[in-house]
Swiss-Prot record:
Enzyme class: lyase
Residues annotated as binding substrate: N221, M250, Y279, H315, S335, R336, G337, D376, G377, L378, R379, E415, Y442
Organism field: Rhodopseudomonas palustris (strain BisA53)
Note describing how the cofactor binds: Binds 1 [4Fe-4S] cluster per subunit. The cluster is coordinated with 3 cysteines and an exchangeable S-adenosyl-L-methionine.
Function, in words: Catalyzes the synthesis of the hydroxymethylpyrimidine phosphate (HMP-P) moiety of thiamine from aminoimidazole ribotide (AIR) in a radical S-adenosyl-L-methionine (SAM)-dependent reaction.
Protein name per the record: Phosphomethylpyrimidine synthase
InterPro entries reported in the protein's UniProt record: ThiC (IPR037509), ThiC-associated_dom (IPR025747), ThiC/Bza_core_dom (IPR038521), ThiC/BzaA/B (IPR002817)
NCBIfam families in the cross-refs: PRK09284.1, PRK13352.1, thiC
GO-annotated cellular components: cytosol
Pathway: Cofactor biosynthesis; thiamine diphosphate biosynthesis
GN (gene name): thiC
Family that this chain belongs to: Belongs to the ThiC family.
Organism lineage string: Bacteria, Pseudomonadati, Pseudomonadota, Alphaproteobacteria, Hyphomicrobiales
Length: 641
C-alpha cells in the first residue's frame, strides 16, 4: 500500500510500502553469493493455480518492510565496498562547497543541507576504473553479475515457454539471448553496446544496464526551477517515479539550491541519477551564457562527480559551424543546453569549449566512472524540422566523440530526438547505430505529432514504442505537462506509466524472451474473471481497481463473471466459457448428435481437416474444373451424404 512517511521523523516525506499484492524478494547469484538482487513478486490468488509472478523492480528499499527508511540519513552504501575491493581508487578531501553552488541563496530561501558527508573517491594510476575498462580487460565486476541477475527476472525455469510464444518477434538486428549471463553483459559493455551508469561515489546505487540487447529502460525527469518546486518535492518525486518503474532519474534543476537538491536526491536514490551540468554552470554566472568559461564548467563537473552523479548530458556536438543550419527551422534550437552553447559560440565566435576540451572531459569523467550521455542540442523541436541537416550533422559529430570517449575508457550513450513523424523514425535509429558504433540510443519520445498540447505523453509514447522496437535502449518520458509547465507528482506517475507501456511494447515486438509472461498472466486472469489478479498484475493496480469500482464497487463484484462494459448477458468471455463448459459436459450420445457421422471423439480441428480432405477428393473426382454444372454438383453432394 501507499504510505506517506511521517514528516516529523523523515524529511522530506516519501512514499513507502509494497505495491498491492506484491512483496520484495531477493535473488542470490551463483557467481557472487554475497549479492542480494531485488525483484518484485506479484502474489496471485489461490484460484489462479499458478506460481506468483516475479517482475523487474526499481523501487529500492522503499518497498521492503524489513528496512526502516530515514531520508535524513540516506540509504545504505554497499557498493562503496565493491569499489574499494577492486582497488585503483583513493579517498580524498573533496572540493569545498561554495555559496555559488547553490546560487548564492541565503536565509529563509536556503534549503537545509544534507547532514551526512562521505569523502569522495577517485581513480588513480592506470588501473581500470570504469565498467568499460574492466569489460575490455575481460574482468567481470559485481555490477555485471548484479545486472545479469536483474535482467533474467528470476524466470529461468519459464523461459522455454516464453521463447516459443515469441518466436515471431522482429529484433532488427538485436541479439537477445534466452538467458543473460555475466559474460554476456561484460561482452556487450566491452563492445560499447551497453553501459552500466554507476559513479564510484554513488554507493547507494542498485546497478542497472542500458543497451538494446536488454530490457528497454525508461528515464523520468525531475528538478526544480526558478519559479516553483522545492527540495522536498523533488526527493518525493524521485521516490514516486521509481515506485512506478523509472529506471533512471535526471535532475534538471535550474533554480536555487541546485547542489543541495541534488545531494538529497543522490543520497536517497537506488537508481542512476543523471544531470545536465551546463544548467548549474549557467546559474553560477548569473544566467548569462556569454559569461560561461571552461574553468567554471570544469569545476561544476568535478563538483557533481564527487557527489556521485552517474551520467552527464554534455552537448559537445553543438559546433559553431552547425548553428547556421538551424536558421530556417520552424522552431529553431529547442534544447536548453543546445541553445546555451549556440549563444556562447556566436557571442565569442569560437568553437564550443565542450568540443575543444572533450579529451579533458573524458579524463575527468573516467576517474569517477561517470557515463557520457552525449546530448542532442540540435534535436528537432517540431515535426517540420525532423531529420534535417542540423540534426544529422550533430549526430555525425557525436559518433566521432563516442570513439574518442571509448579510447579514453569511458562509457557512452547517445541522446536522440525529439519531434519525428512515424515514417521518419527508423532512419534515426539506423543512422545512430551506423554513426555511433551501436552505442546505446536514448531518446525523448519522439513525439509523432505537434497537435496535442496536454497529451504529449501520448503523442510521444507512440514514437517511443516504435523506436524502442527498432533498437533504442532507453526512453526518456514525456508528461502531460510537456511544453506547458513543470510536472507535479501525478504528472510524473502518468509519464512513467505511459513509458513503461511503450518500453514493454518494444520488448514484446523485439521478441524479448521474458516479456510476454506478464501479458499471458493478465490474459488468463481476465478470462477467468480473477479481477484482483487482473488489477495487481497491471502496471497501475490502483487505477485499474478504481475504474472498476466506479460502477461495481462491492466485494461481490470482484468475483462476478462480467463487468459494467457488457453486463452479465453480453460478456464475450463468459459466453465462451459457457460454451466450453457445455461441450465438456456432453455425453457420447449428445456428441454423436452434434458431430457428423464418423467424427465422434475427434477434435474440432480434426473434423475440419477431415472435411477439407473430402472436398479435395471431390474436386479431383469431378475433373479438377473450376466451373461445374450445378446439377452435377448436386448429384455429387447426394452421393457424399
Amino acid at each position: 500500500m501507499n504510505i506517506r512517511s511521517n514528516p516529523d521523523t523523515t524529511r522530506p516525506a516519501v512514499t513507502t510500502g509494497a505495491l498491492p499484492s506484491s512483496q520484495k524478494i531477493y535473488v542470490t547469484p551463483d557467481a557472487a553469493p554475497d549479492l542480494r538482487v531485488p525483484l518484485r513478486e506479484i502474489i496471485l490468488s489461490k484460484e489462479a493455480a499458478e506460481p506468483n509472478l516475479p517482475v523487474y523492480d526499481t523501487t529500492g528499499p522503499y518497498t521492503d518492510p524489513a528496512i526502516t527508511i530515514d531520508v535524513n540519513a540516506g540509504l545504505k552504501r554497499p557498493r562503496t565496498q565493491w569499489v574499494l575491493e577492486r582497488g585503483g581508487v583513493e579517498q580524498y578531501q573533496g572540493r569545498e562547497i561554495k555559496p555559488i553552488d547553490n546560487g548564492n541563496v541565503s536565509g529563509e530561501h536556503a534549503a537545509a543541507a544534507f547532514k551526512a558527508y562521505h569523502q569522495p573517491l577517485r581513480g588513480v594510476g592506470d588501473s581500470p576504473i570504469t565498467q568499460y575498462e574492466f569489460a575490455r580487460k575481460g574482468i567481470i565486476t559485481k555490477e555485471m553479475i548484479y545486472v545479469a541477475t536483474r535482467e533474467n527476472l528470476g524466470r529461468k525455469q519459464q523461459l522455454e515457454r516464453a521463447e516459443a510464444a515469441l518466436a515471431d518477434g522482429e529484433s532488427f538486428g538485436a541479439a537477445i539471448p534466452a538467458f543473460i549471463t555475466p559474460e554476456f553483459v561484460r561482452d556487450e559493455i566491452a563492445r560499447g553496446r551497453a553501459i552500466i551508469p554507476a559513479n564510484i561515489n554513488h554507493g547507494e546505487l542498485e546497478p542497472m544496464i542500458i543497451g538494446r540487447n536488454f530490457l528497454t529502460k525508461i528515464n523520468a525527469n525531475i528538478g526544480n526551477s526558478a519559479v516553483t518546486s522545492s527540495v522536498e518535492e523533488e526527493v518525493d518525486k524521485m521516490v514516486w517515479a521509481i515506485r512506478w518503474g523509472a529506471d533512471t532519474v535526471m535532475d534538471l534543476s535550474t533554480g536555487r539550491n541546485i547542489h543541495t537538491t541534488r545531494e538529497w536526491i543522490l543520497r536517497n536514490a537506488p537508481i542512476p541519477i543523471g544531470t545536465v551540468p551546463i544548467y548549474q554552470a549557467l546559474e553560477k554566472c548569473d544566467g548569462d551564457p556569454v559569461k560561461l568559461t571552461w574553468e567554471l564548467y570544469k569545476d561544476t563537473l568535478i563538483e557533481q562527480c564527487e557527489q556521485g552523479v552517474d551520467y552527464f548530458t554534455i552537448h559537445a556536438g553543438v559546433r559553431l559551424a552547425y548553428i547556421h543550419l538551424t536558421a530556417n527551422r520552424v522552431t529553431g534550437i529547442v534544447s536548453r543546453g543546445g541553445s546555451i552553447m549556440a549563444k556562447w559560440c556566436l557571442a565569442h565566435h569560437q568553437e564550443s569549449f565542450l568540443y575543444t576540451h572533450f579529451d579533458e572531459i573524458c579524463d575527468l569523467m573516467r576517474k569517477y566512472d561517470v557515463s557520457f550521455s552525449l546530448g542532442d542540442g540540435l534535436r528537432p523541436g517540431s515535426i517540420a524540422d525532423a531529420n534535417d541537416r542540423a540534426q544529422f550533422a550533430e549526430l555525425e559529430t557525436l559518433g566521432e566523440l563516442t570513439k574518442i570517449a571509448w579510447d579514453k575508457g569511458c562509457q557512452v550513450m547517445i541522446e536522440g530526438p525529439g519531434h519525428v513523424p512515424l515514417h521518419k523514425i527508423k532512419i534515426n535509429m539506423d543512422k545512430q547505430l551506423k554513426e555511433c558504433g551501436e552505442a546505446p540510443f536514448y531518446t525523448l519520445g519522439p513525439l509523432t505529432t505537434d497537435i496535442a498540447p496536454g497529451y504529449d505523453h501520448i503523442t510521444s509514447g507512440i514514437g517511443a514504442a516504435m523506436i524502442g522496437w527498432f533498437g533504442c535502449a532507453m526512453l526518456c518520458y514525456v508528461t502531460p505537462k510537456e511544453h506547458l509547465g513543470l510536472p507535479d507528482r501525478n504528472d510524473v506517475k502518468v509519464g512513467v506509466i505511459t513509458y513503461k507501456i511503450a518500453a514493454h511494447a518494444s520488448d514484446l515486438a523485439k521478441g524479448h524472451p521474458a516479456a510476454q509472461l506478464r501479458d499471458d498472466a493478465v490474459s488468463r486472469a481476465r478470462f477467468d474473471f480473477r479481477w484482483q489478479d487482473q488489477f495487481n498484475l497491471g502496471l497501475d493496480p490502483d487505477t485499474a481497481k478504481a475504474f472498476h469500482d466506479e460502477t461495481l464497487p462491492k466485494d461481490a463484484h470482484k468475483v462476478a463473471h462480467f463487468c459494467s462494459m457488457c453486463g452479465p448477458k453480453f460478456c464475450s468471455m463468459k459466453i465462451t466459457q459457457d460454451v466450453r463448459d457445455y461441450a465438456a459436459g456432453l455425453g457420447d450420445n449428445e456428441k454423436a448428435a452434434l458431430y457428423p457421422a464418423g467424427h465422434v471423439g475427434m477434435t474440432i480441428s480434426g473434423v475440419i481437416e477431415d472435411g477439407m480432405a473430402q472436398m479435395s477428393a471431390k474436386f479431383r473426382d469431378m475433373g479438377e474444373e473450376l466451373y461445374l454444372d450445378a446439377e452435377k454438383v448436386k448429384e455429387s453432394n447426394r452421393a457424399l451424404s
